[in-house]
């Protein structure tokens, strides 16, 4: 039990497995354990994190600031929802110790090889990967439709599913070798080209979660640089017709 500003909170404790590590979680709300239900484990924890009311207040203030910058009204988010954001923030900052970073993109695998699509919000990442699912059927598996984890090693990059999977809730508790990263742009015609790390790096940095601490930021940027050197990089100009999925797939498998 924890007291904050005169309010008593019953702690909710559980463990989850993410990106090859087991995290001991101390949360404020039972809904957070339910949110993580597909990742629960009884294995010993690699490290532990605890969410506090201060963490939830930080998430609310952050969302309000971002809404103001974008000219939107503040979101009326529940404390339970904001706790899930605070929890992921704490986890991913610790996972940097294991060369693992959070990346904003939609990741789908075909025949056990993962393809990660990234772009500015609203470009159509999820719409595009849904086209892959329609084309490839059971061969295609959504790893994570919004915030996958990428573990970078000398053997390559492995992508992991997480329960933080966007508004469509498309994810799988699995891992898969990352075949390629593709920067998606809108176009009237479908075309794909391979690009070098220098061309891709600004978007890769923008779409990677960077902690506030200088050490965490430095570690993240080093991992992003390694990511750009570890897998092929592409730029896809596409419309939302089904053929866009085939153009992308064949372009990354030449």
Regions found by a protein language model. Name each.
Residues 43-91, 252:
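Charged, amphipathic alpha-helical linker segments immediately N-terminal to NTP-binding catalytic cores
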Residues 124:
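Conserved glycine(s) of the Walker
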Residues 74-121:
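Glycine-rich adenosyl-nucleotide cofactor-binding module
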């Amino acid at each position: 039990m924890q007291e904050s500003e005169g309010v008593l909170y019953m702690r909710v404790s559980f463990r989850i497995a993410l990106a090859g590590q087991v995290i001991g979680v101390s949360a404020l709300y039972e809904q957070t354990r339910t949110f993580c239900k597909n990742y629960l484990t009884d294995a010993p924890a690699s490290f532990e994190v605890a969410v506090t009311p201060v963490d939830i207040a930080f998430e609310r203030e952050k969302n309000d600031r971002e809404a103001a910058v974008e000219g939107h009204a503040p979101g009326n988010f529940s404390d339970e929802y904001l706790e899930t954001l605070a929890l992921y923030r704490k986890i991913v900052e610790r996972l940097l110790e294991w060369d693992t970073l959070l990346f904003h993109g939609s990741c789908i695998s075909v025949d056990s090889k993962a393809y990660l699509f990234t772009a500015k919000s609203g470009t159509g990442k999820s719409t595009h990967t849904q086209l892959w699912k329609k084309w490839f059927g059971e061969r295609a598996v959504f790893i994570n439709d919004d915030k996958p984890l990428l573990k970078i090693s000398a053997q390559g990059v492995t992508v992991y599913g997480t329960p933080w999977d966007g508004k469509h809730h498309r994810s799988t508790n699995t891992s898969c070798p990352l075949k390629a990263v593709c920067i998606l742009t809108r176009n009237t015609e479908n075309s794909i080209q391979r690009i070098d790390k220098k061309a891709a790096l600004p978007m890769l940095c923008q779409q990677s979660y960077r902690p506030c601490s200088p050490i965490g930021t430095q570690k993240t940027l080093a991992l992003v640089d390694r990511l750009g050197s570890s897998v092929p990089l592409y730029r896809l100009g596409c419309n939302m017709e089904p053929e866009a999925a085939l153009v992308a797939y064949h372009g990354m498998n030449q």
